[in-house]
Amino acid sequence: NIAKDESKFEITYNAVKDSGFQFYSYDRGECEKYGLKFNTIMYDRTLTLQTAHEQYDTLFLGYLKDRKEDILSLYDMFTSAGLTPRFVIVSNGERKEKFPFEYRDDYVGYYDYLKMVGTSRAILDIAQQKQDGYSMRVMEAIFFNKKLVTTNTAVKQSVFYDENNIFI
């Protein structure tokens, strides 16, 4: 997401733009703003989930970034509704705070994350501010036949949108 560090992107872009490189983004807004080429996010269809007991209603794994208030609000909403969410926040060097969910100091590998997905009925996708493109969470919900709860309203315009499987 360029919006989180626009100056770093501009430095990189200006340094290599005359070297024949092409820049792509899965976010249409970024493509329009910066003159990039659009391409959807890709996913490896050969990945599979291990069969597991679905013990959580929703799974969120990610950094806090600019989403702290949304994350806390959604966690409270899910637990108040009697759901069993699993939220795993990975440290990004920010000050540790007391959260009502899992907090990890170390990176969670993708295969470990997929094990978490296998134990959840739905995947929670909390878009970053100014993000229009679909995240990997959207693709994972589709490929692993999981429900999707997302804050990304652009999903409603997609060809795969199904109100029975996707909640915005």
Q: Model-found features: residue ranges?
A:
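A generic local structural motif
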Residues: 8-12, 44-48, 108-111, 136, ...
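Short, polar loop motifs at secondary-structure junctions
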Residues: 24-32, 89-95, 151-156
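Short, mixed-charge, low-aromatic patches
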Residues: 31-33, 72, 95-97, 132-139
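Hydrophobic anchor at the start of a short beta-strand
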Residues: 36-39, 84-86, 148
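Catalytic donor nucleotide-activated moiety binding site of glycosyltransferases and closely related
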Residues: 69, 73-111, 153
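Catalytic binding pocket for nucleotide-activated donors in carbohydrate/polymer assembly enzymes
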Residues: 99-105, 113-168
